[in-house]
Curated annotation (Swiss-Prot):
The organism's place on the tree of life at top rank: Eukaryota
Entry keyword Cytoplasm: yes
PROSITE patterns the record matches: PCI
GO annotation, cellular component aspect: eukaryotic 43S preinitiation complex; eukaryotic 48S preinitiation complex; eukaryotic translation initiation factor 3 complex, eIF3e
Biological process annotations from GO: formation of cytoplasmic translation initiation complex
Annotated function: Component of the eukaryotic translation initiation factor 3 (eIF-3) complex, which is involved in protein synthesis of a specialized repertoire of mRNAs and, together with other initiation factors, stimulates binding of mRNA and methionyl-tRNAi to the 40S ribosome. The eIF-3 complex specifically targets and initiates translation of a subset of mRNAs involved in cell proliferation.
Assembly with partners or alone: Component of the eukaryotic translation initiation factor 3 (eIF-3) complex.
CDD domains in the record: eIF3E (cd21378)
Alphabetized HAMAP family for the sequence: eIF3e (MF_03004)
Protein's recorded name: Eukaryotic translation initiation factor 3 subunit E
Domain PCI: 246-426
Amino acid sequence: MADNTPTTANDLLNDATQAAAKSPEEIAKENDLLPKLITHLDRHLIFPLLQFVGDQDDEPSPEITKAKFELLKKTNMTDYVASLHCEIEGVDEAPKEYANKRQEILQRLEIFGQESEKITDLLGREDVVTGLRSDKVANLEFLKKEHDVTIEMVNVLYDFGNFQYSCGNYGAAAELLYQFRVLSTDDDKVTAATWGKLACEILTGNWESAMEEVQKVKESIETKLFNKPLAQLHHRTWLIHWALFPFFNHEPARDVICDLFFSPAFINTIQTACPWILRYLTAAVITNRNRTRNTGQYQKQLKDIIRIVKQENYEYSDPVTDFIKALYLDFDFEEAQKKLSEAEEVLRSDFFLVAASENFVEAARHLISESYCKIHQRIDIKDLSARLGLNQDDGEKWIVNLIRDTRVDAKIDYKEGTVVMNHPPSSVYQQVIERTKGGFFRTQVLSAAVAK
């Protein structure tokens, strides 16, 4: 017999809550950006991302192994591709074609070595290098006259560098592409060599050199493509994705790339072509709270990211950007805590952000507490702890440290379990002055401009 008991509102609410609750794995899967990222990365740069996904599984994933095989089968990394083939097919020995291809690659390496030997030896000599100038045409003339160097010999450096890159010999490839770039006057090949060298520096973890190449690629986009806006948009989109590697792996790069992404041309590119990059820019701005000494710059970046998240919310959102929306646009502290919890799972499953997850959570808790304290005179420690995702004991310790570190004017009433904020009274006159100060300054500037 069917149960005819009527469904209550509480039953519906509980069912909805249970249905809405998602596991960490579901949250991570729903917010996986890998399909979007790989369309803007070279195949060699995609490999570390696949490796990261594979490392998260307890057992080797056949899907990841097949993806690696498909990714690298057209490269010269024959030995590794052969091992992947054996793993996929469950055999001990790879087909003979891999041994044949390996032999062909070794022969090509030997030929390239012979063809480039003269020019690489010359570029390794101090007396030759000191004779080079910034004028590439003059350099080629000098090398042709003094050492019988030809354009064909210079182009061999480019071809050899590409070949070494395909073999996975990134250090050797970087050196060859650098030498080619010093001498070549072929703009297209020089641009390609710069992208190639950037990839090499990323893959070898030479972050300072990678940042130099990021700047060179940026300059190339601005100068060589200045009259081709669509090409600029395309190249900037790719550079934004490649720059994520030093962005979160090299501390000194954080401020430089933040400034780059916030620049008008690049923030426009992000909003137009790749709004999912807002996850990384938002995470960088939030974590900058714990590392920057320039409070003014940090506040400006925070205001900018709030504005951009608001503009792009219809186009892109994830728990990281939703945290900003909940806290600064909706002023919903419960939703902010929920999104922070989800954002933590997203960061832990993101190749670029996994190392920043703890700093992000810590900085986000500071932002929640700062916003909460601004609008409350007396704060219940238990309530604030819950909003920060902490138990009462941990929350109390965290709040004590916050008051000590930020030197905020507040007292803890342990008996009542509350924090009493001492907000200095602000007169109506002072508020009017603060609000009109900026307008008065702008009026002065405009008046001066008109007077000229």
